[in-house]
C-alpha cells in the first residue's frame, strides 16, 4: 500500500472520531445503501453486495441477469464519473432526497457529486425493477464470470 493510500485510509477512519459535535458526512456507499433501501425496502441492501458477476467488488464476464446488468451499468457509470477531475465516486458524497420510493438528486451538487448521485439513483431504480434470483447470490465468480 502506498503512503498516499495509507493517508486516505487514515483520514477516512479517523475523521469520524474527531471532537466535533457535528456528525461526520457519510461516505458515498452509505448514501448508495440508503438509496437502495428507498427503492427496494423489502430487501436488505446486503442482498445486492455479492450478487452475480458485477454487484459488489469488481466485475467481469457476462452479467448473469438483469439485476447483475444494473450493477455492470453502475460500475461503468462510476468509471465515467472518475473522468471528472478529482472525482472519486466511492468517496464522493452528494445531496439527494427520498420521498415515498422516489429518488431525486438535489441541485447544488458539483459536477462530480451530480454524476455520482445520478449513477446511484439510476442503479437503485434499476434494482427495484429487476427480479432477484437467490441462485445468483454469492456465486462462484471464477466459474461463472469469465
UniProtKB/Swiss-Prot annotation:
Active site residues according to the UniProt entry: 74, 120
Residues bound to Ca(2+): 54, 56, 58, 75
Role: Snake venom phospholipase A2 (PLA2) that has high affinity for muscarinic acetylcholine receptors mAChRs (CHRM) and has the ability to activate them. In guinea-pig ileum, produces an onset and dose-dependent contraction. Also has weak anticoagulant activity. PLA2 catalyzes the calcium-dependent hydrolysis of the 2-acyl groups in 3-sn-phosphoglycerides.
Expression across tissues: Expressed by the venom gland.
Gene3D superfamilies: Phospholipase A2 domain
Catalytic reaction(s) noted: a 1,2-diacyl-sn-glycero-3-phosphocholine + H2O = a 1-acyl-sn-glycero-3-phosphocholine + a fatty acid + H(+)
Prodomain positions: 22-27
GO cellular component: extracellular region
Name of the protein in its database record: Acidic phospholipase A2 1
Keyword Membrane included in the entry's annotation: no
Cofactor note (record): Binds 1 Ca(2+) ion per subunit.
